[in-house]
């Protein structure tokens, strides 16, 4: 199934978090925090500003982004957990 977000929404897939610390301790799944980084899989067309002009989003497919632990709405698509969130819920784009 393919998702096409509407308006100023983006589809993000969480990046897997390390399950082992630098000292070699393995962190069990139930003790690990949700990762707060992800990859943008799809972006909506944008939204209209107060003047009625159309404004495109500042993120693009493939961008690595930071967001809050509880940001967005989780949806399952073909067995993958994805997040649907507004662009304003993103904190930053991580540089390459």
UniProtKB/Swiss-Prot annotation:
InterPro entries in the record: Chaperonin_GroES (IPR020818), Chaperonin_GroES_sf (IPR037124), Chaprnonin_Cpn10_CS (IPR018369), GroES-like_sf (IPR011032)
Protein name, per record: Co-chaperonin GroES
Keyword Chaperone part of the UniProt annotation: yes
Gene Ontology cellular component terms for the protein in this record: cytoplasm
Species of origin: Leptothrix cholodnii (strain ATCC 51168 / LMG 8142 / SP-6)
Xref: Pfam families: Cpn10 (PF00166)
CDD domains: cpn10
Major location (coarse): cytoplasm
Subunit organization: Heptamer of 7 subunits arranged in a ring. Interacts with the chaperonin GroEL.
């Amino acid at each position: 199934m393919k998702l096409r977000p509407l308006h100023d929404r983006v589809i993000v897939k969480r990046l897997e978090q390390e399950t082992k610390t630098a000292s070699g301790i393995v962190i069990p799944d139930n003790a690990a925090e949700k990762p707060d980084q992800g990859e943008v899989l799809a972006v909506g067309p944008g939204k209209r500003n107060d003047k009625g002009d159309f404004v495109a989003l500042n993120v693009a497919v493939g961008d690595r982004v930071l967001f809050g632990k509880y940001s967005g709405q989780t949806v399952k698509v073909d067995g993958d957990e994805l997040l649907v969130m507004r662009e304003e819920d993103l904190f930053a784009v991580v540089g390459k």
